[in-house]
Regions:
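Alpha-helical scaffold segments that mediate packing/assembly in large oligomeric complexes
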Residues: 89, 99-183, 321-326
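Extended oligomerization regions of viral-like shell subunits
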Residues: 156-290, 296, 326
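Short intrinsically disordered coil segments
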Residues: 76-81, 116-121, 208-210, 306-318
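Short loop/turn segments at secondary-structure transitions that flank enzyme active sites
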Residues: 66-71, 108, 130, 199-201, ...
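Protruding loop/beta-arch "assembly-hinge" segments enriched in small, turn-prone residues
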Residues: 2-26, 30-34, 51, 283-326
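Short alpha-helix boundary/capping segments
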Residues: 94, 111-119, 280, 284
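Assembly/oligomerization interface modules of large self-assembling protein complexes
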Residues: 14-100
Protein backbone atom coordinates (compact mmCIF):
# COMPACT_ATOMS: atom_id res chain seq x y z
CA UNK A 1 0.00 0.00 0.00
CA UNK A 2 1.41 3.37 -1.10
CA UNK A 3 1.68 6.04 1.64
CA UNK A 4 1.81 9.79 0.77
CA UNK A 5 4.58 11.50 2.71
CA UNK A 6 4.83 15.23 3.50
CA UNK A 7 7.67 17.07 1.83
CA UNK A 8 9.22 18.99 4.73
CA UNK A 9 11.41 21.01 2.37
CA UNK A 10 8.39 23.18 1.62
CA UNK A 11 8.75 24.67 5.12
CA UNK A 12 12.50 25.16 5.14
CA UNK A 13 11.97 28.96 4.99
CA UNK A 14 9.64 31.27 6.96
CA UNK A 15 5.98 31.25 6.01
CA UNK A 16 4.93 33.85 3.43
CA UNK A 17 1.78 35.94 3.31
CA UNK A 18 0.29 38.59 1.07
CA UNK A 19 0.63 41.60 3.37
CA UNK A 20 -0.51 45.25 3.04
CA UNK A 21 2.68 46.40 1.34
CA UNK A 22 2.31 43.79 -1.37
CA UNK A 23 -1.30 44.64 -2.09
CA UNK A 24 -1.04 48.39 -1.51
CA UNK A 25 -1.84 49.27 -5.11
CA UNK A 26 -5.10 47.30 -4.86
CA UNK A 27 -6.36 48.95 -1.66
CA UNK A 28 -8.34 52.15 -2.30
CA UNK A 29 -7.62 55.20 -0.15
CA UNK A 30 -10.55 57.20 1.12
CA UNK A 31 -10.05 60.89 0.38
CA UNK A 32 -11.54 63.61 2.57
CA UNK A 33 -14.15 65.65 0.76
CA UNK A 34 -13.44 68.77 2.77
CA UNK A 35 -10.40 70.89 3.50
CA UNK A 36 -9.54 70.98 7.19
CA UNK A 37 -8.85 74.54 8.24
CA UNK A 38 -9.08 76.86 11.21
CA UNK A 39 -11.98 79.12 12.01
CA UNK A 40 -12.15 82.16 9.78
CA UNK A 41 -11.88 85.30 11.87
CA UNK A 42 -12.63 88.69 10.42
CA UNK A 43 -12.03 92.17 11.84
CA UNK A 44 -12.60 92.45 15.58
CA UNK A 45 -12.44 96.24 15.35
CA UNK A 46 -15.18 96.53 12.74
CA UNK A 47 -17.43 94.16 14.68
CA UNK A 48 -16.94 96.13 17.91
CA UNK A 49 -16.78 99.71 16.60
CA UNK A 50 -19.64 101.91 15.35
CA UNK A 51 -20.31 101.98 11.62
CA UNK A 52 -21.21 105.34 10.12
CA UNK A 53 -22.98 105.92 6.83
CA UNK A 54 -20.99 104.80 3.80
CA UNK A 55 -18.71 107.44 2.34
CA UNK A 56 -19.64 109.04 -0.98
CA UNK A 57 -16.15 110.46 -1.50
CA UNK A 58 -12.64 109.90 -0.17
CA UNK A 59 -13.16 112.28 2.77
CA UNK A 60 -15.89 112.21 5.40
CA UNK A 61 -16.17 115.41 7.47
CA UNK A 62 -17.45 114.89 11.00
CA UNK A 63 -18.36 117.85 13.27
CA UNK A 64 -17.31 117.18 16.87
CA UNK A 65 -18.29 119.23 19.91
CA UNK A 66 -15.20 121.10 21.06
CA UNK A 67 -16.45 123.77 23.49
CA UNK A 68 -19.27 123.62 26.04
CA UNK A 69 -21.54 126.55 26.94
CA UNK A 70 -21.18 127.92 30.48
CA UNK A 71 -24.06 129.13 32.68
CA UNK A 72 -23.75 131.78 35.43
CA UNK A 73 -25.69 132.94 38.45
CA UNK A 74 -27.09 136.45 38.11
CA UNK A 75 -26.09 138.73 41.00
CA UNK A 76 -29.24 140.41 42.32
CA UNK A 77 -32.40 141.53 40.59
CA UNK A 78 -30.66 143.82 38.15
CA UNK A 79 -27.45 141.88 37.64
CA UNK A 80 -26.13 141.52 34.13
CA UNK A 81 -26.45 138.23 32.36
CA UNK A 82 -23.23 136.94 30.83
CA UNK A 83 -22.82 135.41 27.42
CA UNK A 84 -21.25 132.12 26.47
CA UNK A 85 -20.53 130.16 23.34
CA UNK A 86 -20.39 126.65 22.02
CA UNK A 87 -17.95 125.44 19.37
CA UNK A 88 -17.45 122.46 17.12
CA UNK A 89 -14.26 121.04 15.70
CA UNK A 90 -13.95 119.25 12.36
CA UNK A 91 -12.53 115.77 12.10
CA UNK A 92 -12.03 113.93 8.84
CA UNK A 93 -12.24 110.26 8.02
CA UNK A 94 -10.04 109.51 5.02
CA UNK A 95 -10.66 106.33 3.08
CA UNK A 96 -7.59 104.29 2.19
CA UNK A 97 -7.39 101.21 0.01
CA UNK A 98 -6.57 97.65 1.03
CA UNK A 99 -5.94 95.23 -1.82
CA UNK A 100 -4.41 91.89 -2.73
CA UNK A 101 -3.98 89.81 -5.89
CA UNK A 102 -4.09 85.99 -5.87
CA UNK A 103 -2.69 84.48 -9.12
CA UNK A 104 -3.16 80.81 -9.96
CA UNK A 105 -2.49 78.68 -13.09
CA UNK A 106 -5.57 77.70 -15.06
CA UNK A 107 -4.40 74.08 -15.14
CA UNK A 108 -4.44 73.98 -11.35
CA UNK A 109 -8.00 75.29 -11.30
CA UNK A 110 -9.07 72.72 -13.88
CA UNK A 111 -7.44 69.77 -12.11
CA UNK A 112 -8.44 70.64 -8.55
CA UNK A 113 -11.22 68.62 -6.96
CA UNK A 114 -12.23 71.61 -4.86
CA UNK A 115 -13.63 75.04 -5.64
CA UNK A 116 -10.38 76.87 -5.01
CA UNK A 117 -11.89 80.35 -5.21
CA UNK A 118 -14.50 79.39 -2.62
CA UNK A 119 -11.63 78.44 -0.32
CA UNK A 120 -9.55 81.53 -1.11
CA UNK A 121 -12.17 84.26 -0.67
CA UNK A 122 -12.88 83.70 3.05
CA UNK A 123 -9.15 83.67 3.78
CA UNK A 124 -8.65 86.90 1.85
CA UNK A 125 -11.43 88.45 3.93
CA UNK A 126 -9.68 87.24 7.07
CA UNK A 127 -6.40 88.77 5.86
CA UNK A 128 -8.17 92.09 5.33
CA UNK A 129 -9.52 91.90 8.89
CA UNK A 130 -6.02 91.33 10.26
CA UNK A 131 -4.64 94.33 8.36
CA UNK A 132 -7.50 96.56 9.56
CA UNK A 133 -7.16 95.49 13.20
CA UNK A 134 -3.39 95.85 13.19
CA UNK A 135 -3.51 99.36 11.74
CA UNK A 136 -6.34 100.69 13.91
CA UNK A 137 -5.21 99.13 17.19
CA UNK A 138 -1.41 99.10 16.91
CA UNK A 139 -0.43 101.38 13.97
CA UNK A 140 0.91 98.39 12.02
CA UNK A 141 1.54 99.51 8.42
CA UNK A 142 -1.13 102.20 8.80
CA UNK A 143 -1.54 104.75 6.00
CA UNK A 144 0.07 108.13 6.63
CA UNK A 145 -3.33 109.84 6.36
CA UNK A 146 -4.79 107.82 9.24
CA UNK A 147 -4.72 109.02 12.83
CA UNK A 148 -2.78 107.36 15.66
CA UNK A 149 -4.00 103.91 16.60
CA UNK A 150 -5.97 103.14 19.74
CA UNK A 151 -2.96 102.04 21.80
CA UNK A 152 -0.88 105.07 20.80
CA UNK A 153 -3.82 107.40 21.50
CA UNK A 154 -4.33 105.93 24.98
CA UNK A 155 -0.60 106.08 25.70
CA UNK A 156 -0.36 109.77 24.76
CA UNK A 157 -3.32 110.51 27.05
CA UNK A 158 -1.60 108.58 29.87
CA UNK A 159 -4.50 106.15 29.97
CA UNK A 160 -2.27 103.15 30.61
CA UNK A 161 -2.19 100.63 33.45
CA UNK A 162 0.87 98.44 33.90
CA UNK A 163 0.57 94.88 35.20
CA UNK A 164 3.65 93.74 37.07
CA UNK A 165 4.51 90.17 38.02
CA UNK A 166 3.38 90.66 41.64
CA UNK A 167 0.41 92.94 40.93
CA UNK A 168 -3.20 92.01 41.61
CA UNK A 169 -4.94 91.65 38.25
CA UNK A 170 -8.37 92.30 39.78
CA UNK A 171 -7.24 95.67 41.14
CA UNK A 172 -5.55 96.59 37.87
CA UNK A 173 -8.88 96.12 36.11
CA UNK A 174 -11.55 97.05 38.66
CA UNK A 175 -9.97 99.30 41.30
CA UNK A 176 -9.64 103.09 41.41
CA UNK A 177 -6.49 103.17 39.30
CA UNK A 178 -7.59 100.31 37.04
CA UNK A 179 -8.26 100.39 33.32
CA UNK A 180 -12.01 100.89 33.75
CA UNK A 181 -11.46 103.86 36.07
CA UNK A 182 -9.08 105.43 33.55
CA UNK A 183 -11.85 105.53 30.96
CA UNK A 184 -14.38 106.83 33.47
CA UNK A 185 -11.94 109.58 34.46
CA UNK A 186 -12.23 110.86 30.88
CA UNK A 187 -16.01 111.05 31.14
CA UNK A 188 -16.81 107.82 29.31
CA UNK A 189 -18.39 104.53 30.35
CA UNK A 190 -16.73 101.29 29.30
CA UNK A 191 -18.97 99.17 27.08
CA UNK A 192 -16.47 96.58 25.87
CA UNK A 193 -13.06 95.00 26.22
CA UNK A 194 -10.75 93.57 23.59
CA UNK A 195 -7.93 91.37 24.87
CA UNK A 196 -5.17 89.02 23.88
CA UNK A 197 -6.22 85.39 24.11
CA UNK A 198 -3.75 84.86 26.98
CA UNK A 199 -6.03 86.99 29.17
CA UNK A 200 -8.54 84.13 29.25
CA UNK A 201 -6.21 82.04 31.41
CA UNK A 202 -5.37 85.03 33.62
CA UNK A 203 -9.06 85.66 34.30
CA UNK A 204 -9.85 81.98 34.86
CA UNK A 205 -7.07 81.83 37.42
CA UNK A 206 -8.24 84.82 39.47
CA UNK A 207 -9.24 83.78 43.02
CA UNK A 208 -10.67 85.56 46.02
CA UNK A 209 -9.19 85.58 49.53
CA UNK A 210 -10.67 82.15 50.22
CA UNK A 211 -9.17 80.63 47.09
CA UNK A 212 -12.43 80.49 45.13
CA UNK A 213 -12.37 81.36 41.43
CA UNK A 214 -13.84 84.80 40.74
CA UNK A 215 -14.88 84.27 37.14
CA UNK A 216 -15.92 80.60 37.36
CA UNK A 217 -18.61 79.04 39.54
CA UNK A 218 -17.56 75.49 38.64
CA UNK A 219 -15.12 73.64 36.39
CA UNK A 220 -17.82 72.13 34.18
CA UNK A 221 -19.62 75.24 32.97
CA UNK A 222 -18.24 77.63 30.37
CA UNK A 223 -16.60 80.80 31.64
CA UNK A 224 -18.54 83.98 30.96
CA UNK A 225 -15.91 86.48 29.89
CA UNK A 226 -17.26 89.90 30.84
CA UNK A 227 -15.92 92.65 33.06
CA UNK A 228 -18.20 94.92 35.08
CA UNK A 229 -21.09 93.91 32.85
CA UNK A 230 -19.29 94.70 29.59
CA UNK A 231 -18.54 91.92 27.09
CA UNK A 232 -15.05 90.80 26.16
CA UNK A 233 -13.78 89.44 22.90
CA UNK A 234 -10.46 87.89 22.03
CA UNK A 235 -9.34 88.53 18.44
CA UNK A 236 -7.57 85.48 17.01
CA UNK A 237 -6.79 86.69 13.51
CA UNK A 238 -3.18 87.33 14.51
CA UNK A 239 -3.44 91.11 14.76
CA UNK A 240 -3.50 91.54 18.55
CA UNK A 241 0.01 92.30 19.86
CA UNK A 242 0.25 91.40 23.55
CA UNK A 243 3.67 93.02 23.79
CA UNK A 244 1.93 96.37 23.32
CA UNK A 245 -1.33 95.68 25.17
CA UNK A 246 -2.86 92.77 27.04
CA UNK A 247 -6.28 94.37 26.99
CA UNK A 248 -8.02 97.42 25.55
CA UNK A 249 -11.05 98.70 27.44
CA UNK A 250 -13.25 101.59 26.46
CA UNK A 251 -16.32 103.14 24.94
CA UNK A 252 -16.24 101.49 21.54
CA UNK A 253 -19.01 103.73 20.25
CA UNK A 254 -16.22 106.31 20.04
CA UNK A 255 -14.38 104.14 17.53
CA UNK A 256 -16.21 104.99 14.33
CA UNK A 257 -15.51 103.89 10.78
CA UNK A 258 -16.96 104.46 7.36
CA UNK A 259 -16.67 102.33 4.25
CA UNK A 260 -16.09 103.90 0.86
CA UNK A 261 -15.99 100.57 -0.95
CA UNK A 262 -16.82 97.25 0.65
CA UNK A 263 -14.60 94.29 -0.22
CA UNK A 264 -15.07 93.34 -3.86
CA UNK A 265 -13.57 90.51 -5.90
CA UNK A 266 -12.71 90.67 -9.60
CA UNK A 267 -11.25 87.88 -11.73
CA UNK A 268 -8.67 88.77 -14.39
CA UNK A 269 -7.62 86.54 -17.28
CA UNK A 270 -5.25 89.02 -18.92
CA UNK A 271 -2.64 91.41 -17.59
CA UNK A 272 0.67 91.27 -15.76
CA UNK A 273 1.51 90.91 -12.09
CA UNK A 274 4.59 92.87 -11.04
CA UNK A 275 7.01 92.46 -8.18
CA UNK A 276 7.65 95.38 -5.84
CA UNK A 277 10.76 96.33 -7.83
CA UNK A 278 8.74 96.63 -11.03
CA UNK A 279 9.83 93.40 -12.67
CA UNK A 280 7.12 91.20 -14.15
CA UNK A 281 6.29 88.18 -12.02
CA UNK A 282 3.49 86.74 -14.16
CA UNK A 283 2.00 87.43 -17.55
CA UNK A 284 -1.47 85.95 -17.21
CA UNK A 285 -2.01 85.34 -20.92
CA UNK A 286 1.47 83.99 -21.58
CA UNK A 287 1.54 81.81 -18.47
CA UNK A 288 -2.05 80.55 -18.81
CA UNK A 289 -3.00 82.00 -15.45
CA UNK A 290 -5.87 83.87 -13.86
CA UNK A 291 -5.75 86.31 -10.94
CA UNK A 292 -8.31 87.22 -8.31
CA UNK A 293 -8.09 90.81 -7.08
CA UNK A 294 -9.72 91.91 -3.83
CA UNK A 295 -10.14 95.60 -2.98
CA UNK A 296 -11.63 97.51 -0.05
CA UNK A 297 -11.59 101.20 0.97
CA UNK A 298 -12.38 102.51 4.44
CA UNK A 299 -11.37 105.01 7.09
CA UNK A 300 -11.85 105.53 10.81
CA UNK A 301 -11.68 108.10 13.59
CA UNK A 302 -12.08 108.65 17.34
CA UNK A 303 -14.43 111.67 17.71
CA UNK A 304 -13.67 112.13 21.44
CA UNK A 305 -15.93 115.19 21.94
CA UNK A 306 -15.50 117.47 24.92
CA UNK A 307 -17.45 116.62 28.06
CA UNK A 308 -17.97 118.20 31.46
CA UNK A 309 -15.64 115.80 33.29
CA UNK A 310 -12.56 116.20 31.12
CA UNK A 311 -12.23 119.35 29.04
CA UNK A 312 -8.54 118.90 28.20
CA UNK A 313 -8.58 116.93 24.95
CA UNK A 314 -4.91 116.00 25.30
CA UNK A 315 -5.76 113.99 28.43
CA UNK A 316 -9.24 112.84 27.42
CA UNK A 317 -9.42 109.38 25.89
CA UNK A 318 -12.33 106.92 25.58
CA UNK A 319 -9.91 103.98 25.77
CA UNK A 320 -7.46 102.58 28.28
CA UNK A 321 -4.94 99.79 27.93
CA UNK A 322 -3.54 97.15 30.25
CA UNK A 323 0.04 96.26 29.40
CA UNK A 324 2.75 94.04 30.82
CA UNK A 325 5.20 95.79 33.13
CA UNK A 326 8.75 96.18 31.93
Amino acid sequence: MFKRRMNLRLFDTDANVIDRSGAESLIPTQEANEIIQGTITQSAVLSRGRKLANMTSRQYKMPVLDMLPIAYFVNGDTGQKKTTKQAWDKKFIIAEEIAVIVPIPEAVLDDAEYDIWAEVKPRVTEAFGKVIDGAILFDVDKPSTWRDGVVTTATKAQSVVTLGASDNLYDKIMAEEGVIAKVEDSGYFVNGHMADISMRAKLRGLKDADGNPIFKSDMQGATSYSLDGSPMNFPNNGAFDKSKALMISGDFSQLVYSIRQDITFKLFTEGVVQNTDGTIAYNLMQNDMVALRAVMRLGWEIPNPINALKTDKTKRCPFSILKVGE
